[in-house]
Every structure is written in C-alpha cells, then in structure tokens.
Amino acid sequence: MKALLVLEDGFTLEGKSFTGDFETGGEVIFTTGMTGYQEILTDPSYYGQMVCMTYPLIGNYGTCREDMESAGVHCAALLVKECCKKPSNWRSTMSLPEFMKRYEKPGVEGLDTRALTRHLRMNGAMRGIISTRETDPAVLQERARALPAMKGHNLVPFVAPEKPYAWYDNAVQEVTVAEDGSYAWRGTGLPLLVYDFGIKWNILRRLCEAGFEPLAVPPGFSPARAKASGAKGVFLSNGPGDPATLTSEIALVRELIHMLPVTGICLGHQLIGHALGARTEKLKFGHHGCNHPVKDLTTGRIEISSQNHGFHVVLDDVDDVEATHVNLNDQTLEGLRHKTLPVMSLQYHPEAAAGPHDGEYLFNRFRKIIGESAGA
C-alpha cells in the first residue's frame, strides 16, 4: 500500500506501508542506531515523533517481551528503508510488522532514508504527515504545518503514570502509598523516590542493580509527600516534550533539591537545570542514537553513549553549578553537578537499552553521593 511522507517545508518521499491503512503526523527525526528499534518504539520519550532509522535494514531479529521499555509503543510512526518480515532470532516472538500492528502504530518502508536524514540534518527536525489515504502533497503539507510544534509542547501528561508503583521481580508492581506520602518499603535496597515523566524500564532495572529500591510516583507527587515517604534520595526520569513548559515540575524540583539528594536523566536533567537557574534550547536535529562520544570532565574518561533528546541545557555561568560531561560532537552539556548540594544529572542514557554500557557507573556514583550526604 502506497504511503506518502510530506514535511512542513514540502519535502516529499514515497514509500509503502507494512502496517495497513493510516494517516498520522508528528515531529520527524532520525536515529543512528543500527539496532534497538524495539527499545526506541517503546521509549516514552519518543512520544509524538516519527522516527527514521538510518540503518537500511530493520527488523532482522524480530521483537520480544524482554526488550520492551514500557507497556506500549509511543512513536507516532517508524520510517525505514527496508523492513524484515521474517526475523532470525531465538528470542523473537513476533516480527516487526506484527508488533507494529498489535499496537496499532504505522510503519513505512521503501523510503529514501538517506535523503530524509540529510534533509533533516541540513534543515532541522520538523513536523510531517505520512498517509496512505491522501495523495496530494500540498494537502499533506498544510496538515503538517497545522500540527503543534515540539517547542512549547508539554507531552508528559500523555505518558506519566496516574498513581505510584514499585519495581521488583523485573516488573511493575501495584503498591499503596498513604495520603501523607508514607510508604512501607520492602527493605531490598536504599529507598529511592522515582518521579516518572515517561521512564524507560531499563532505568529501573539499573537502579535495582545499583542497590536501590525504587518507588515510582506521578509528576504531581508533592515535596511534603516525598519527605514523608522516607526515601533517601530522588530520581527524575526521562520523558517527552519541551522541558521549559513543565513549570510546576520545575518548581517541585526547586524544593526537592534542598530536601534530599537528587539526580536525573534526560528530561530529569533538564528539569534540574531549570531549577538551578539554567535554561534549555532546542537542538537543530537532536541527539538520537547509540554512538555519541561524551567526555567525563571529572575523570577525563571518554564514553560512547546512548542518547535521545531534542533539547539541551545551557548553563550561562549559573552560580554553584559546574559541567561534568560534554558531548564531543557539538560540545553541548551532557552532565552537571551542584558544588555544595548533593545534586547531579545526565543528559544521556547510562542505562543504554539499546546501546553501550560505558556510563553504568553513574548509578553507583549517585548512590555514593547519597551515602556521603547521609554521613554529613
């Protein structure tokens, strides 16, 4: 079935749907990972985005339950050069087309993904529409222009949980948290309050491996309830959308950093930046992929990192805050810490999924910060 992709500037490509009849829109981006398509599809941070895979053959190893990063698919669409219909992998339980159809998400192959990637690299990520129903590019261009821009758009409410939950036995578990915030911890690790703005499950796995007992809570979980919970630290998760729009969450973080040790990844890092007086700017085409070089300024160590963000933190000489990590491709900020408060954060994804594990040590670094804070 023919599918037409049209960007807001009129750039047009023709492909073929491998998931049936549809029309959908969103911000069109590209990711440079050769693998990890299932993790990308199920990462809530990709909510509202149509993802172009730069590697030409996608779906070779199928899909499986173990590679899920949430309970569903959040990408608006998957754009590939060629989709493999018959995977070869002993772990696979479903082909990529079957997986996409199960979650009712569009997939398109036969696109010139190289041309699309070059266009986005030169002109920036932009809104687009892909349709099997409308054949007039001018009509689809107007529809693309009518879509909300990512800048200024709060997408967290679409992916955040409505009530608290725990993570153990490698799964989400229902729990009861009292009205005042008090909670009966299981005693399996250091109590950690996790603000879920659209978290990846592998972050929760890595927190457990680092010796934490995570309790995930919705974005509206108040500082008073956080204090009453008995948690020894706070973790702020990844998530979609423009961080500058999350004014109530920024105010929340501003209080939390004076109560407990705090760390964050991706959107959580950006919220910490805002709370400390920094600002965020939108990147031209974002950082999406498993091969971004980062330098840890505290050790001089170079890491290859997994990244997925369209915004970045700009410090602008913020008092008492220093950079800890920098991206070696474009020199943008990848990590920060407060000089006196037990606060640190990272823009990239040390939990990987998919990607290299060079940054896993940072979960233990935060645990050490909590220990030092408790002993102070």
From Swiss-Prot:
What InterPro entries does UniProt report for this protein, alphabetically?
Answer: Anth_synth/Amidotransfase, CarbamoylP_synth_ssu, CarbamoylP_synth_ssu_N, CarbP_synth_ssu_N_sf, Class_I_gatase-like, CPSase_GATase1, GATASE
Region of interest called CPSase, as start-end residue ranges on this chain: 1-187
Q: Name a single GO biological process.
A: L-arginine biosynthetic process
For this protein, the Enzyme Commission number is 6.3.5.5
| The family this protein is said to belong to | Belongs to the CarA family.
Q: Which residues form the active site?
A: 266 (nucleophile), 349, 351
Asked whether the UniProt record includes Nucleotide-binding among its keywords, one would answer yes
Pathway terms, separated by semicolons: Amino-acid biosynthesis; L-arginine biosynthesis; carbamoyl phosphate from bicarbonate: step 1/1; Pyrimidine metabolism; UMP biosynthesis via de novo pathway; (S)-dihydroorotate from bicarbonate: step 1/3
Residue sites binding L-glutamine per the record:
45, 239, 241, 267, 270, 308, 310-311
What is the originating organism of this protein? Desulfovibrio desulfuricans (strain ATCC 27774 / DSM 6949 / MB)
Keywords on this record? Amino-acid biosynthesis, Arginine biosynthesis, ATP-binding, Glutamine amidotransferase, Ligase, Nucleotide-binding, Pyrimidine biosynthesis
Instruction: Name the enzyme group at the top EC level.
Output: ligase
One Pfam family per UniProt:
CPSase_sm_chain
Catalytic activity line of the entry: hydrogencarbonate + L-glutamine + 2 ATP + H2O = carbamoyl phosphate + L-glutamate + 2 ADP + phosphate + 2 H(+)
Matching PANTHER family: CARBAMOYL-PHOSPHATE SYNTHASE SMALL CHAIN, MULTIFUNCTIONAL TRYPTOPHAN BIOSYNTHESIS PROTEIN-RELATED
Q: Where would I find the Glutamine amidotransferase type-1 domain in this sequence?
A: 191-376
Assembly notes = Composed of two chains; the small (or glutamine) chain promotes the hydrolysis of glutamine to ammonia, which is used by the large (or ammonia) chain to synthesize carbamoyl phosphate. Tetramer of heterodimers (alpha,beta)4.
Any one Gene Ontology MF annotation carried by this entry is:
glutaminase activity
Disulfide pairings: none
What task does this protein carry out? Small subunit of the glutamine-dependent carbamoyl phosphate synthetase (CPSase). CPSase catalyzes the formation of carbamoyl phosphate from the ammonia moiety of glutamine, carbonate, and phosphate donated by ATP, constituting the first step of 2 biosynthetic pathways, one leading to arginine and/or urea and the other to pyrimidine nucleotides. The small subunit (glutamine amidotransferase) binds and cleaves glutamine to supply the large subunit with the substrate ammonia.
| This protein's encoding gene | carA
Q: What is this protein called?
A: Carbamoyl phosphate synthase small chain
Q: Which residues form the signal peptide?
A: none
Q: Which SUPFAM superfamilies match?
A: Carbamoyl phosphate synthetase, small subunit N-terminal domain, Class I glutamine amidotransferase-like
